[in-house]
């Protein structure tokens, strides 16, 4: 059996929902080479027919049945896509009818509700959070009064991508503080962070993994040396323990999982955008 399987994320909007769900499903299966393709804004019959032709062509090329993860809200478009002969995984279809029965109300099919700019106030909060994360990255700005969370860690432990994810998906004002050699020498919480204990969350990482990451940035330097990585991680972990800062290892943890842990630990209740 061929291990190659074409997978299409098809949507009448951005395709983010279909791709996110599809990716989560595919990670449950090993030993396959999934060839993925996102087809966004398939919002009329002509586009749906063109998409179905592309899916069918992929099946003929790889001699295997394609998979379509479909988030189109119009049932007619889904029917056209199904003519491709692909395995259809509909994101919304299994849930719409039960909800209609439970709520005793018909659905109002609206394209792009999940990731469109429907609520300007929410969108504005999201953009402001992103600007905040970028301006407070790696200790660039030290005014943390408006921060919802401050991630603390040694360099290259995953602070920046986590802050950006929190901003984009939850509208969280996330700052991050890189522990310097001076901070680590004292093994105490840096003075500029002491007034913000309730906002602090520590990230740690396996020293070997940290060395691999740092080698990509600055190979064969003191910064990326194995001993430096071991010392910095061990010292940071002692500091977190002494200062009672909640901590999570990023070594084998996805950004999504890190973000969820940060939110739950600090009691930040936000809906995902």
From Swiss-Prot:
- In the record, what terms sit under GO molecular function? ADP binding; ATP binding; phosphotransferase activity, phosphate group as acceptor; protein serine/threonine kinase activity
Top EC class for this record = transferase
Q: In its keyword annotation, does this UniProt entry include Nucleotide-binding? A: yes
Instruction: Give the transmembrane ranges.
Output: none
Disulfide connectivity for this sequence is: none
**InterPro entries the UniProt entry points to:** Kinase-pyrophosphorylase, PSRP
Quote the Pfam families the UniProt record gives. Answer: Kinase-PPPase
For this protein, the Enzyme Commission number is: 2.7.11.33, 2.7.4.28
Specify which residues bind ADP according to the UniProt entry for this protein. 153-160
- Give the catalytic activity: [pyruvate, water dikinase] + ADP = [pyruvate, water dikinase]-phosphate + AMP + H(+); [pyruvate, water dikinase]-phosphate + phosphate + H(+) = [pyruvate, water dikinase] + diphosphate
- Which keywords does this Swiss-Prot/TrEMBL entry list? Kinase, Nucleotide-binding, Serine/threonine-protein kinase, Transferase
The UniProt entry's sequence similarity note says: Belongs to the pyruvate, phosphate/water dikinase regulatory protein family. PSRP subfamily.
The record describes the protein's role as:
Bifunctional serine/threonine kinase and phosphorylase involved in the regulation of the phosphoenolpyruvate synthase (PEPS) by catalyzing its phosphorylation/dephosphorylation.
Q: PANTHER family this protein is in? A: PYRUVATE, PHOSPHATE DIKINASE REGULATORY PROTEIN 1, CHLOROPLASTIC
Protein name, as recorded: Putative phosphoenolpyruvate synthase regulatory protein
Give the source species: Xanthomonas campestris pv. campestris (strain B100)
Lineage, top ranks: Bacteria, Pseudomonadati, Pseudomonadota, Gammaproteobacteria, Lysobacterales
């Amino acid at each position: 059996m061929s291990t190659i399987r074409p997978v299409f994320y098809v949507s009448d909007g951005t395709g983010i929902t279909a791709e996110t769900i599809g990716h989560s499903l595919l990670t449950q299966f090993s030993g396959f080479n999934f060839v993925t393709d996102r087809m966004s804004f398939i919002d009329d019959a002509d586009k749906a027919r063109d998409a179905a032709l592309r899916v069918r062509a992929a099946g003929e090329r790889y001699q295997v049945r394609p998979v379509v993860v479909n988030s189109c809200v119009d049932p007619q478009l889904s029917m056209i896509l199904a003519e491709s002969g692909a395995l259809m995984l509909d994101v919304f279809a299994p849930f719409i009818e039960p909800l209609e029965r439970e709520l005793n109300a018909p659905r109002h099919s609206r394209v792009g509700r999940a990731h469109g700019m429907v609520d300007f106030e929410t969108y504005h909060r999201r953009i402001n959070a992103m600007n905040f994360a970028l301006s407070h990255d790696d200790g660039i700005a030290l005014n943390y009064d408006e921060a919802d969370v401050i991630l603390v860690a040694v360099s290259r432990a995953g602070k920046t991508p986590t802050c950006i994810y929190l901003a984009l998906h939850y509208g969280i004002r996330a700052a991050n503080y890189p522990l310097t050699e001076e901070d680590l020498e004292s093994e105490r919480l840096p003075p500029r962070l002491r007034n913000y204990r309730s906002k602090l969350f520590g990230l740690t990482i396996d020293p070997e993994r940290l060395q691999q990451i740092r080698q990509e940035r600055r190979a064969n330097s003191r910064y990326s040396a194995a001993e430096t990585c071991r010392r910095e991680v061990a010292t940071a972990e002692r500091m977190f323990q002494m200062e009672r800062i909640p901590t999570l290892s990023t070594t084998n943890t996805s950004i999504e999982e890190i973000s969820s842990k940060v939110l739950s630990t600090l009691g930040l209740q936000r809906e995902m955008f």
